[in-house]
């Protein structure tokens, strides 16, 4: 068994850990970092297609906010979470995508005036919608096997 820390290692937010066991790669959380755009680059530090399953511990953005980026980068497997977390993610991820798109449009307009290059949104509403289709609600008890 191997545990890799891809987020919340140097800072408190941005929880993202990969557990490798029995030839399977399970991602535990995939969160946004708080503290500015520099922490939320458009790339992941691992191959999204190599992940077999995702478990989201809870709906806070620093534990779930990069799920649409994971899907945008090719992840197509299940995303396990409690029903309550799934319900919140349906609202939060779509809202976050709208904010990402709006921020990218604002920055593009600003950068066009100054001659700086434009940046793409971290992810789009369609990426969030695609992510929601992968949610698999699980019910406690906590001993549920995935």
Name each region found by the language model:
Residues 1-14:
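N-terminal metal-binding scaffold of metallo-dependent hydrolase/deaminase domains
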Residues 9-11, 21-77, 81-85, 92-130:
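Pre-active-site segment of Zn-dependent metallo-hydrolases
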């Amino acid at each position: 068994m191997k545990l890799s820390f891809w987020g919340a290692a140097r800072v408190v937010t941005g929880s993202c850990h990969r557990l490798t066991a029995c030839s399977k790669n399970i991602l535990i959380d995939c969160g946004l970092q708080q503290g500015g755009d520099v922490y939320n680059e458009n790339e992941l530090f691992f191959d999204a297609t190599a992940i077999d399953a995702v478990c989201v511990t809870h709906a806070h953005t620093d534990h779930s906010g990069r799920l649409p980026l994971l899907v945008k980068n090719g992840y197509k497997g299940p995303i396990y979470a409690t029903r309550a977390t799934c319900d919140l993610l349906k609202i939060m991820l779509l809202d976050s995508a709208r904010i990402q798109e709006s921020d990218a449009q604002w920055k593009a307009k600003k950068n066009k005036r100054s001659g700086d290059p434009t940046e793409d949104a971290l992810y789009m509403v369609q990426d969030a919608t695609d992510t929601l289709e992968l949610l698999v609600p699980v019910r406690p008890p906590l001993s549920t096997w995935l």
